[in-house]
């Protein structure tokens, strides 16, 4: 399968101005490495346009996905990534890229022990990430490194026993983070979010609302004219900034 996929990528670069990748994987222990160089490339999902591509869909246990989109105006869209022990490496270098990720969005399949590593370098990029909104993703490890300006990142996670590290170096970025779930029973296994921010005029809206009120948050900033709103709520009255 990897040989066929590689052939398609090489062939498409000589025929089409914009490359497209379709992946529908079912089975355990799959390792998938996709790299696109240039602009206006697409890794498909149900919302993909161009030639009516369907979803990048991965179903199985112990899968590894390595995505490298190097260039501008590229799009990554996943219809569903479902399964435990998933490892994802996502590198986006360039401007005006779009990244949409759904993982166990329906809550019908577990997505525990997930390790996501995200590296974004560039400006005016957009990300929309939803992980187990209707269930939970236990023992999630989410690491971000964002370098650039005017990026917008929205992520919604239902989890327990999880850690989320975000390192932002840039200005005029917008981060919207909503965390819910049962959370852990002690401080050592709770939902933990660590943010390191360098840059000005950033806007951050963070909500942690675990059932057991075991959420932890650490923010370190070297910033001016930024707006940071944090709400921690275990079921009290509605609060907003």
Regions found by a protein language model. Give the residues of each.
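Cross-kingdom Sec-pathway N-terminal secretion signals
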Residues: 8-10
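Positively charged n-region of N-terminal signal peptides that target proteins for export
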Residues: 1-5
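N-terminal signal peptide c-region/cleavage motif recognized by signal peptidases
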Residues: 12-14
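Low-complexity repeat regions of mature extracellularly deployed or surface/particle-associated proteins
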Residues: 18-241
């Amino acid at each position: 399968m990897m040989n066929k996929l590689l052939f398609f990528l090489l062939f498409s670069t000589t025929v089409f101005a914009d490359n497209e990748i379709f992946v529908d994987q079912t089975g355990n222990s799959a390792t998938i490495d996709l790299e696109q160089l240039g602009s206006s490339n697409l890794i498909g999902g149900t919302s993909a346009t161009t030639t009516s591509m369907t979803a990048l869909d991965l179903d199985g246990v112990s899968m590894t996905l390595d995505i490298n989109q190097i260039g501008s105006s590229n799009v990554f869209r996943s219809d569903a990534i479902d399964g435990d022990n998933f490892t994802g490496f996502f590198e986006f270098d360039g401007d005006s890229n779009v990244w949409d990720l759904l993982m166990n969005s329906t809550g019908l399949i577990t997505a525990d022990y997930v390790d996501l590593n995200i590296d974004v370098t560039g400006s005016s990029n957009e990300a929309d990430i939803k992980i187990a909104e209707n269930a939970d993703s236990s023992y999630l490890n989410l690491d971000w490194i964002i370098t650039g300006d005017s990026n917008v990142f929205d992520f919604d996670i239902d989890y327990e026993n999880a850690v989320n590290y975000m390192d932002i170096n840039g200005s005029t970025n917008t981060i919207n983070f909503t965390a819910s779930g049962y959370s852990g029973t002690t401080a050592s296994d709770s939902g933990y979010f660590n943010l390191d921010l360098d840059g000005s005029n950033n806007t951050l809206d963070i909500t942690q609302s675990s059932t057991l009120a075991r959420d932890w948050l650490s923010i370190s900033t070297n910033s001016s004219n930024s707006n940071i709103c944090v709400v921690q709520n275990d079921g009290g009255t509605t609060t907003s900034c």
